[in-house]
Design a protein with these regions (language model features):
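Extracytoplasmic/periplasmic soluble domains downstream of a signal peptide or transmembrane helix
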Residues: 126-130, 136-236
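Beta-strand cores of secreted/periplasmic/IMS beta-sandwich domains, seen most often
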Residues: 23-26, 85-101, 150-167, 203
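N-terminal low-complexity, Pro/Thr-rich disordered segments
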Residues: 33-81, 193, 227-236
């Protein structure tokens, strides 16, 4: 009997240790790997842009008097390639050091390396809905502080030639994973009623679950050439 009790106890200890190791892997190691992967993607983009290996997406235009920033006419970029980074996102509300790469596609392999652009939604700066997903927890926790986002917050992206500043209009809005209308070209639940240049960000809810989704919607507020310097939203 003692042998049986000892064996069961040892098995319980072993299983408990394995669970602890698994939790440590999920909480720590996936984050370390994801942070490294995201930094690598950003470094690669900066190298490409410094070498001029990016197709220009905009040409200088008039000055936006209210914002004091240059408005540019945005041309359609080349098609995005699955799993490849094409832009960097900045959200000052989440910290002035917060920056994440945006890659094409929403596969698990893509989400492990950064934010994921929903294939089939609008390209950056184009008419329609530029929709992006990101993990709330694990894999670097890119959208851990998603609930802090508020209307009026800036979401800034660059593709190496142009800065795009979006302004949040609504959210965070809670819904279910099957509610795919949130990334429609004109997402009605956002309050938008006509075509425009929109941005949708999505992540999981609750923080450690995935039974629901949190959504924010934004509109394109301004654009400017990278030669003009950082947009006002990124200036401290």
């Amino acid at each position: 009997m003692r042998v049986i009790v000892r064996t069961v106890s040892e098995l319980c200890i072993t299983v408990g240790a394995l669970i602890v190791l698994f939790v440590a892997y999920v909480l720590f190691w996936t984050g370390v790997r994801a942070d490294g992967a995201m930094n690598d993607q950003i470094d690669q983009l900066h190298r490409q842009w410094s070498q001029g290996s990016v197709r220009p997406t905009a040409a200088p235009g008039r000055k936006a008097a209210a914002a004091g920033e240059q408005t540019v006419a945005v041309a359609k970029p080349a098609p995005y390639r699955y799993g490849k980074a094409f832009a960097i996102m900045y959200i000052p509300r989440l910290g002035f050091t917060w920056n994440k790469p945006v890659l094409e596609g929403t596969g698990r392999d893509v989400l492990a390396k950064g934010l994921a652009h929903y294939a089939g939604t609008a390209q950056l700066g184009q008419e329609g809905n530029f929709a992006v997903a990101g993990h709330r927890r694990t894999y670097g926790d890119p959208f851990k502080d998603f609930p802090r986002l508020r209307p009026g917050d800036a979401v800034v992206l660059t593709d190496g030639t142009t800065w795009f500043t979006y302004r949040i209009d609504k959210g965070p809005y809670k819904t279910v994973p099957t509610d795919v209308e949130v990334i429609d070209p004109v997402p009605r639940k956002s309050g938008y009623t006509r075509p425009g240049r929109y941005l949708t960000l999505t992540t999981c809810d609750p923080e450690w679950g995935h039974s629901h989704r949190l959504i924010v919607w934004a509109h394109l507020d301004s654009t400017q050439s990278v030669e003009a310097g950082e947009p006002r939203a990124l200036r401290r």
